[in-house]
């Protein structure tokens, strides 16, 4: 059964022309897709993505955002840690901003993007979601 699931995940996440490539030969976006596919082999209810938008080009960011939305629609919870706030807030239902090791603020993307304290301490005064 795992072999069938693994094969399906490879088909869903990895383009056929790179399936036999070694990990070091993959681009950043291709590596992220592979990391996500690997995390799904155990059929989890939640996955953790650590810095999924770091070091990838804008097209790959959109691709990974689409994958995350697909996972959400399949009722797979996704916990993201990332410093790329704009990319992360644009796809989250609820977010937590940490400051000095503590939760500074939590809420919807719109709430956080408009919160004066969040802007002053973390996001920057000119931060906007659009």
Question: Which residue stretches match the model-derived regions?
Answer:
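Conserved ABC ATPase "signature" region
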Residues: 1-18, 69, 117
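Hydrophobic anchor residue at the start of the ABC signature
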Residues: 36
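Helical segment within the ABC ATPase nucleotide-binding domain
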Residues: 62-74
């Amino acid at each position: 059964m795992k072999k069938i699931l693994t094969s399906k995940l490879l088909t869903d996440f990895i383009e056929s022309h790179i399936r036999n490539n070694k990990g070091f030969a993959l681009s950043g976006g291709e590596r992220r897709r592979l990391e996500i596919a690997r995390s799904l082999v155990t059929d989890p209810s939640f996955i953790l993505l650590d810095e999924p938008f770091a070091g990838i080009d804008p097209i790959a960011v959109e691709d990974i955002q689409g994958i995350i939305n697909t996972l959400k629609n399949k009722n797979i919870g996704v916990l993201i840690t990332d410093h790329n706030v704009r990319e992360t807030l644009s796809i989250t239902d609820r977010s937590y901003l940490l400051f000095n090791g503590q939760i500074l603020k939590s809420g919807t993307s719109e709430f956080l993007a408009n919160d004066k304290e969040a802007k002053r301490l973390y996001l920057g005064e000119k931060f906007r979601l659009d």
